[in-house]
Amino acid sequence: VGKTLFTTGYSEDNQGAAYADNGEGFIEKKGGFIFENALEMFGAGDDKTLLAMEIARNLPTRRLHIIDAETGLVKQISNINIFVEPAIDPRETKISWPTALKVRGDKLFIPFQKIKNEFDDKGAAVDHGTTDPDEAFVAVFSYPNIGTDPEKIISDNRTSNIGVNGATTGLIEADNGDLYSFSCGAVMAGFSAASTKPSGILRIKNNETEFDSEYFFDVEAATNGGKLFSLDYAGGNKAIARILTNDSGNKWEAFGRTVFNQKL
């Protein structure tokens, strides 16, 4: 974030730290913080603010940390409900898996996938599946005064859920302020079941909080069946995309090294 490098632990390591150039050519620790569950989604409020989110697999509430990049200290922690659809059996309850934290102006956009609140008899979370893969979802919150619940949730059925597990760029911002989302929907990227909708890109215009009904980039049509696996903004209204050339492997296999079917 800005000129600050953040590091965070995972699993049993619940500590984070901020580092920066001390002005004498050396990297120096500026501060640190702790968290309860692993931080698995990140974004920037601005050049001086890190957003980091705890995403417990068996809890519906998401814990958002707002961290000062200049001190490395937590300024605010908010418990938010991105999406919850209760069920009589708690294991059938649908909750959110966020795939980006994107601030634009006075809004925080959080694209998400719907997953089941599944856990085993010992209370441990199990591998989750995408329960509604044929639609894109974004929760829109106020910012920086973040409420417990989103102002609204927008959706689009022209493509699949936005983003993939482990990536933080489900939404990117162009120079003119327009936001672009990427949808994958591939089994090899962790979707279960696979989406029947084409992998593609949607747009939310600057100063708008709805998907642009006049814009849709069909990635599968443009790449002879390829699916977006990542999308990173490169400046000048251009982005670098990583494409899965096919989706013939097993679940999560795109993250491994046994099959290589990716191209830029």
Regions found by a protein language model. Give the residues of each.
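Short coil/turn segments that connect the beta-strands within blades of beta-propeller domains
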Residues: G2-T4, D47-T49, G105-D106, N176-D178, ...
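Short, conserved, GDST-rich strand-edge loop motifs in beta-rich repeat architectures
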Residues: M53-R57, P111-E135, S181-P198, R242-Q262
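Beta-propeller fold detector
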Residues: G25-N37, L73-R91, P133, G147-T159, ...
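Post-signal peptide N-terminal segment of secreted/secretory-pathway proteins
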Residues: V1-N79
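Repeated scaffold domains used in trafficking and secretory/extracellular systems
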Residues: V1, I34-D47, P86-L101, N161-L171, ...
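Intrinsically disordered, low-complexity segments enriched in Gly and acidic/Ser/Thr residues
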Residues: D212-L264
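Loop-centered beta-sheet repeat module
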Residues: H128-L202
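Beta-propeller blade signature
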Residues: A18, R62-G72, G123-G147, A194-T209, ...
